[in-house]
């Protein structure tokens, strides 16, 4: 089973396309929707939904995947639920770069203080990070600097922030899932 978390643009047709691409490596892909506007509520909702999906599945190696803001959540929710994560162009600082787009960006700071201390050290090796060199929203060199001590980084030379086409990374994802 692969659990897919969309980014800030939850209505993007690219989400459906990514789900279809993910089905090439696992026919059981679950799309979990969340508001993107209310971080504390989103976290509670995502933990509950992802935990429920894991409990209902007979897959012993489920995977959670997200793009942008979905990558932020996939890393944290995957860690908290004990499953591997694949994150594409993750938004590591939504409290800063979501200001003006959501009602309470400061909630991300509060979420960060409630997370397990040094969770990336504890999560080392359980997350695969794919970063685009053409990300027009985030500086992915900063993302790589923050994550490369803990996770394998794959650089993509063609995609932009939304990562419409993930097919070139499916085999790496499949190998990582196993």
Curated annotation (Swiss-Prot):
It comes from the Bacteria. Gene3D superfamilies: alpha/beta hydrolase. Transmembrane segments: none annotated. SUPFAM superfamilies: alpha/beta-Hydrolases. InterPro entries: AB_hydrolase_fold (IPR029058), UPF0227 (IPR022987), UPF0227/Esterase_YqiA (IPR008886). Belongs to the UPF0227 family. PANTHER family: ESTERASE YQIA-RELATED, UPF0227 PROTEIN YCFP. NCBIfam families: PRK04940.1. This is UPF0227 protein PBPRA2397. The lineage of its organism: Bacteria, Pseudomonadati, Pseudomonadota, Gammaproteobacteria, Vibrionales.
């Amino acid at each position: 089973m692969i659990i897919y978390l969309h980014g800030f643009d939850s209505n993007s047709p690219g989400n459906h396309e990514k789900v279809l691409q993910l089905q090439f490596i696992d026919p059981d892909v679950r799309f979990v929707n969340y508001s993107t506007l209310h971080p504390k509520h989103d976290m509670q909702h995502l933990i509950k939904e992802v935990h429920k999906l894991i409990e209902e599945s007979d897959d012993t190696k489920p995977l959670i995947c997200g793009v942008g803001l979905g990558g932020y959540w996939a890393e944290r929710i995957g860690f908290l639920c004990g499953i591997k994560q694949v994150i594409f162009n993750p938004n590591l600082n939504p409290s800063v770069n979501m200001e003006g787009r959501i009602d309470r960006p400061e909630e991300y700071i509060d979420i960060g203080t409630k997370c397990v201390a040094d969770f990336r050290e504890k999560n080392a090796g359980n997350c695969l990070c794919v970063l685009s060199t053409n990300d027009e929203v985030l500086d992915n060199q900063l993302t790589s600097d923050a994550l490369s001590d803990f996770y394998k980084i794959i650089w993509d030379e063609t995609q932009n922030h939304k990562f419409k086409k993930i097919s070139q990374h499916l085999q790496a994802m499949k190998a990582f899932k196993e």
